[in-house]
Regions:
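Conserved ATP-binding subdomain of kinase catalytic cores across diverse folds
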Residues: 2-102, 132-136
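A short, terminal or domain-edge coil/loop segment
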Residues: 13, 19-23, 90, 120-136, ...
């Protein structure tokens, strides 16, 4: 498998919307005629590593064959910025294509997700991915998931909290049980609709797939070559952090942690 192809795009219109969330991402129409939700450099010492996490997370999610929006490096032209948005001039943004015909999975919408063995497998795989990549931003209170009702695809979004929320100066640490989507209502909703046998079979399949995902992920380590130089990242620091994901002990502990969390939140193993 080749390294995920990254598109390099530029804005062709003014920023059309500013999302009033923590990172204040912006929506912009790009040169491929698609709209992208973009996160960008700001006068902040840690934001570059957060952008790196977004890119690493997106590429690893692709290696895992998760449903995730296409990603691009976006040059938002100076005259297209909204004056109310503080940003670093000249530094490219990271953009995720805006998905159409999807709903945001939340406490008021999760029951619209069709509960069956396929959506169960998708959610289990996303949960395992989060354990492996130490994604602290997807929790029972913040799913960071979209859902396409027509195709029954669960779509993973937002990777700024991977690698333990940008703590690049410390070793990776395993997520706690409450950090997992397995503790969320959507998992209980899907899990109670399938048999214990189906759950067991899905976990067996996932364990086999896990090691294949790790193998494909190793080929994505060239992600470093795609990071804009304007982000002024320490390539050595990022490389060491990515290497931690592929340590044998980390891979084994991740699976064990995932299974323990699964047992606490389902009838698996009972």
């Amino acid at each position: 498998m080749l390294v995920m192809s990254i598109s390099y795009l530029h804005s062709i219109q003014d920023v059309s919307f500013v999302y009033e969330t923590g990172d204040r991402p912006v929506l912009v129409l790009c040169s491929d005629m698609q709209q992208y939700i973009c996160k960008y450099m700001r006068p902040n010492s840690t934001i570059a590593y957060k952008l790196a996490c977004e890119l690493i997370g997106a590429q690893m999610a692709d290696a895992w064959n998760l449903n995730t929006p296409p990603v691009a490096i976006v040059n938002i032209k100076p005259n297209h910025w909204n004056n109310s948005v503080s940003h670093s001039i000249g530094a490219p943004a990271i953009g995720f294509r805006k998905m159409e015909n999807v709903l945001d999975v939340a406490s008021t919408t999760y029951k619209q997700v069709t509960p069956n063995k396929d959506t169960l497998y998708q959610l289990l795989k996303i949960a395992l991915f989060d354990f492996w990549i130490a994604n602290e931003d997807r929790t029972c209170n913040n799913a960071n998931l979209l859902y396409n009702v027509e195709t029954e695809q669960i779509i993973s979004i937002d990777y700024g909290g991977v690698l333990n929320n940008v703590l690049f100066d410390n070793p990776l640490s395993q997520l706690t049980e409450t950090d997992s989507i397995l503790c969320a209502d959507i998992f209980a909703h899907i899990c109670k609709a399938v048999s214990p046998k189906t759950l067991f079979q899905n976990v067996q399949l996932l364990e086999k797939d896990y090691y294949k995902c790790i193998g494909r992920g190793k080929k994505q380590k060239a992600v470093l070559q795609t990071m804009p130089k304007e982000w002024s990242l320490s390539a050595d620091k990022v490389a060491l952090k990515i290497d931690e994901l592929f340590a044998t002990q980390w891979i084994e502990e991740t699976w064990q942690n995932f299974v323990e969390c699964l047992m606490s939140n389902s009838n698996y193993g009972k």
